[in-house]
Amino acid sequence: MSSGNYQQSEALSKPTFSEEQASALVESVFGLKVSKVRPLPSYDDQNFHVYVSKTKDGPTEYVLKISNTKASKNPDLIEVQNHIIMFLKAAGFPTASVCHTKGDNTASLVSVDSGSEIKSYLVRLLTYLPGRPIAELPVSPQLLYEIGKLAAKLDKTLQRFHHPKLSSLHRENFIWNLKNVPLLEKYLYALGQNRNREIVEHVIHLFKEEVMTKLSHFRECINHGDLNDHNILIESSKSASGNAEYQVSGILDFGDMSYGYYVFEVAITIMYMMIESKSPIQVGGHVLAGFESITPLTAVEKGALFLLVCSRFCQSLVMAAYSCQLYPENKDYLMVTAKTGWKHLQQMFDMGQKAVEEIWFETAKSYESGISM
């Protein structure tokens, strides 16, 4: 498929439901009386914050998720995601509750006549989780440690998850799976010809030479794959000393889940925690310490971490530039990572792998002695 045709098909896939249509969907599919809806930002799906009329014992706030046409063609994957959300909630993780349709399913396929064709979209309803995205707050080393720990616990817990359609998480050409970094090559035109593109091309080259050859040595698991600073919610409480303490109150967006490796999860988490940090290079050590308190990395995994973090920066930055060409009206949301991401990636390259690793690994080691840096 040519890039032109590919762009067009991708552009058509994002849902464009109005607030009135979203409200009608909730009432017809889930049987709830809607009092108000408001759109929420989303990368390539459509989300709405839904308020319903007070019921005797049910929640009054939900998130309506409308999958794009491409994702809607894979109902098995959506079903597995829903069951993972329910499984993690039962295991004590702060995930949403999945609402059942009037037909007692966890999702429903709705068809819409767009005039030129009929499009089908999978719709789901999840309970709305309280809290603020950590992107809105300065994150302490202790919270970074807890987020690293959470990422490892999540992956480890999912080793116990079973489902007859689990194979749907083997997403071979999924652009957001970290092992598919070489697939970025067909989107590089979105960057133009500049220094940023040169860095990305260099990262892809190193990835092919130094990561692809080591994949068989990494330990496999199911990855959340998108523990970014907008998908982790936190709430504050007062400590005994009167200071504010923050706890994770919500984990959002399981749409990028796939089979991967433990080291992928920690690399992705480190990269996203760097985005808003005033000391981005320091972040990795605290996240790594938390992760390794549950799942210590092997020497081979540790050796790949620097390049994997760089690779995730490249995935996010390239796909944001590409998506901005498709959805210019969504530019503010799509370019959140780019505001600081290019600068952080450049800094990592300027410092070099050895210097960055030294900071990360020394910081992580300091937790073992009880004196965190």
From Swiss-Prot:
MF terms (GO), sorted A to Z: amino acid kinase activity; hydroxylysine kinase activity
Pfam families: APH
EC number(s) recorded for this UniProt protein: 2.7.1.81
Cellular localisation: Cytoplasm
SUPFAM superfamilies: Protein kinase-like (PK-like) (SSF56112)
Keywords: Cytoplasm, Kinase, Transferase
Principal cellular location given in the protein's record: cytoplasm
Domain of life from the UniProt record: Eukaryota
Catalytic activity: (5R)-5-hydroxy-L-lysine + GTP = (5R)-5-phosphooxy-L-lysine + GDP + H(+)
GO cellular component: mitochondrial matrix
Active site: 226
EC class (word): transferase
A GO biological-process term: lysine catabolic process
Function noted in UniProt: Catalyzes the GTP-dependent phosphorylation of 5-hydroxy-L-lysine.
Family: Belongs to the aminoglycoside phosphotransferase family.
Protein name (record): Hydroxylysine kinase
Organism of provenance: Homo sapiens
Record gene name: HYKK
